Amino acid sequence: MFGLAAAPEVDDSLAAAAAADLSLEVSNEIPDFIQKGDREGADQIAAEDARIPRLVLAQAQTPQAMRGDPVYIDGLAAGMAFNDLTNVVYGEAPLEVIVVRADKPRWVEFGDDRSVIDPSVPPGDLRTQFTTDPETKKRIPPKATMFYDYVVLLGPQMEPLALSFKGSAIKLSARPLNGLIKMKPVPIYACKYRFTPRFMKNDEGTWYVFNVAQIGVLKNQETFQKAKEQFNIFKLKDVSFDVEHPDTDAPEDGSGI
């Protein structure tokens, strides 16, 4: 009989050293020796075959913020914003964005198991309406969840991100943002806004929303032109927005509608 060979010992110090060396070899910044805009090798990937990342405000039940979850992002905690594609954590600090697209509200119907039953519930459908319990006379939230969707440009790099609001964030974030957008007699992409994570609490639990404030109208012509270019790119583009069940983000009490 042959015995099993002993498993080779792993030198953790070597793995750590390799990781340290790798961190010195890569960067999110494009070095001077690489030509910006050169898409060599990626020509076959059409715009419709790629999705832009989403700007997400982590909640207690967000998988990326839960230690032990396979998709956990190191350092991410509830109340922090992050990029769901690159896993970059933006943190708790206020974010400066330019809005280049604001869609009409849409509705999604979810099942009891949080699966999507109908991703495109028509406006005016009975599932989008509040009802009243005949016995308790209490208002019952619609069966379908309302979403407000945007495309924003984040920070000095003007990084395009998809952004969706649902639940209480509609009343606390989306509608204030829409009001600010309508206030100025300028194109939607001509203003900059500040999104600040805000802690919320009620009988259903705790969660975070973005507090929205307008910084002002863009003064730099180059920034304005870049924002206009992104507006033209995304105004008709099919963007993959959030279709997550509201329980993964915040307590859903119907107060957002």
Model-predicted regions and their roles:
Residues 1-157, 202-209, 214-218, 256-257:
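OB-fold ssDNA-binding interfaces and closely related basic DNA-contact patches used
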Residues 31, 171-178, 224-232:
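Generic detector of well-ordered alpha-helical segments enriched in charged/polar residues
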Residues 145-209:
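Extended serine/threonine-enriched, polar tracts that run as long, contiguous segments within proteins
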Residues 183-187, 191-192, 196-257:
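Accessory, usually C-terminal, subdomains that scaffold auxiliary metal cofactors
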